[in-house]
Amino acid sequence: EDDHDHHHHHHHHHHHHGVGGGGGGGGGGA
């Protein structure tokens, strides 16, 4: 999923380490 997501979705929490604090919310942002 990580590789697939890396190509299509850059909004995932694992990619946006800067918003790691809001990573939980990042999932909601997705």
From Swiss-Prot:
Transmembrane segment boundaries: none
Q: In which tissues is it expressed?
A: Expressed by the venom gland.
Q: Where is the composition biased (Basic residues)?
A: 1-18
Q: Where do the segments described as Disordered lie?
A: 1-30
Q: Which domain of life is it from?
A: Eukaryota
Quote the protein name from its UniProt record.
Poly-His-poly-Gly peptide 2
Query: What is the role of this chain?
Result: May serve as a metalloproteinase inhibitor during glandular storage. Their inhibition may be instantly disengaged, by dilution or physiochemical change, when venom is injected into tissue of the victim.
Where found?
Secreted
Keyword annotations for this protein? Answer: Metalloenzyme inhibitor, Metalloprotease inhibitor, Protease inhibitor, Secreted
- Specify the signal sequence span: none
Q: Name one GO cellular component term.
A: extracellular region
UniProt lists compositionally biased (Gly residues) regions at 19-30
> One MF term from GO for this chain?
peptidase inhibitor activity
Say which family it is in. Answer: Belongs to the pHpG family.
